[in-house]
């Protein structure tokens, strides 16, 4: 009897691997848990071809997303400066703060493209002036924009 069997995972399993990974597991684990619950498939030449095809499609999608992020990064740097208007006191200190949501809204107005506010990293802004803001567009692509805070 085989000590280990190979299976291809259909979904991410924390202790084993990710969707599409070829892993070796105990025969009982495969027979009693993975295969009946459709979490894995036994390894056959057909299944291996399907996995390779799925990986190729996923790599194409990832490359397209990365290229889109690079294009958007170029667009952001072309625009140059984004302006946020806030209420300011007599001493030049802001009432409230400039939030990630404010920056996302300004970028959306200028580019017509939504950015998740959680992907924006801003320094603490307490007054009017110019600041550098980091935006994560993709796992490998970041953009730095110039943000100007003015009073209205």
Curated annotation (Swiss-Prot):
Protein name: Large ribosomal subunit protein bL9
Alphabetic keyword roster: Ribonucleoprotein, Ribosomal protein, RNA-binding, rRNA-binding
Database matches in SUPFAM superfamilies: L9 N-domain-like, Ribosomal protein L9 C-domain
InterPro entries: Ribosomal_bL9, Ribosomal_bL9/RNase_H1_N, Ribosomal_bL9_bac/chp, Ribosomal_bL9_C, Ribosomal_bL9_C_sf, Ribosomal_bL9_N, Ribosomal_bL9_N_sf
Lineage of producing organism: Bacteria, Bacillati, Cyanobacteriota, Cyanophyceae, Synechococcales
UniProt-recorded Gene Ontology molecular function terms: rRNA binding; structural constituent of ribosome
Purpose of the protein: Binds to the 23S rRNA.
Single biological process term from Gene Ontology: translation
Gene3D superfamilies: Ribosomal protein L9, C-terminal domain, Ribosomal protein L9, N-terminal domain
One Pfam family, short name: Ribosomal_L9_C
Family: Belongs to the bacterial ribosomal protein bL9 family.
One cellular-component annotation, GO: ribonucleoprotein complex
């Amino acid at each position: 009897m085989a000590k280990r069997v190979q299976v291809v995972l259909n979904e991410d399993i924390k202790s084993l691997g990710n969707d599409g990974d070829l892993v070796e597991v105990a025969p009982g684990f495969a027979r009693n848990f993975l295969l009946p619950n459709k979490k894995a498939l036994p390894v056959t030449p057909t299944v291996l071809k399907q996995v390779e095809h799925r990986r190729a499609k996923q790599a194409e999608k990832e490359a397209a997303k990365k290229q889109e992020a690079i294009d958007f990064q170029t667009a952001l740097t072309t625009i140059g400066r984004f302006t946020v208007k806030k209420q300011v006191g007599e001493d030049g200190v802001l009432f409230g703060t400039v939030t990630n949501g404010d920056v996302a809204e300004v970028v959306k107005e200028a580019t017509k493209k939504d950015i998740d506010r959680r992907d924006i990293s801003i320094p603490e802004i307490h007054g009017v002036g110019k600041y550098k803001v980091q935006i994560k567009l993709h796992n490998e692509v970041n953009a730095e924009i110039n943000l100007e805070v003015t009073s209205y």
